[in-house]
Amino acid sequence: MNRTIIAIAGGGFSQHIPAYIDEYIINEVRSDGAVRICFIPTASNEAQGYIDRFYEAFPHCDASHVTQDKLASPLMQAFLNEQDVLYVGGGNTQFMLKKWREAGFDALLKNAYQQGAVLAGISAGAMCWFDVCLCEKEDGSYEEVQGLGLLAGTFCPHYQEPARKEAFDKWQTEAIIQPSYTLTDDETLHFRNEELLAKLIT
């Protein structure tokens, strides 16, 4: 059984419907019926408009989403294991990881990944899979945050932004974290069994 992570720097259904990268994710799933895809909007603090766009983007799938009050549900692991795709939205990486760890949801995601669920995510939802990431704070500065460690190294989305690029380059030079992936908003990385399979430009 292959393990798959698709790390999206920007774009996707939050900007375009239909979006090529979202079709690409669905095509990764081998399913006889409707693809079961679950959206995890923790990083946006469950912004309703974001959730609505998710359902609009995947009308032919068996779509669902997970709210913060359900993260620690005793039924959550079984639910996640039933999904073909777990799609993590963008937003505040630090807030998202804190909520996940408080609920033990990070461990549930790792287990679902080992069971064959495709992990996909955009921006914060892409950074989180790596060992460590550099995250923007509310005051515009940046801080190092420990990721889930499913993929080695670090990942920087939105690398076309001058302030982010400068902060990341300085941090990466001092921290010497490898591998180090820097992506602009039209780029995506596809990993299979923790190895980089492809870089997509959309």
For each predicted feature, which ranges?
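Conserved anion/nucleotide-ligand pocket segment
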Residues: F155-I201
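N-terminal beta1-alpha1 cap of cysteine-dependent amidohydrolase-like domains
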Residues: M1-V85
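Structural motif
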Residues: A7, V85-G89, A120-G121, F155-C156
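Class I SAM-dependent methyltransferase SAM-binding "motif I" and its flanking Rossmann-like core
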Residues: L97-K99, D106-E166
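Solvent-exposed alpha-helices and their adjacent loops that cap or buttress functional pockets
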Residues: F79-L80, N111, G147-G149, T173-E174, ...
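Flexible gly/pro-rich beta->alpha loop and the following alpha-helix that scaffold active-site loops
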Residues: A63-A117
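Short, hinge-like loop/turn segments at secondary-structure boundaries
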Residues: Y55-E56, K137-D139, A198
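Short glycine-rich anion-binding loops that position phosphate/pyrophosphate groups of nucleotides
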Residues: G11, G91-Q94, G125
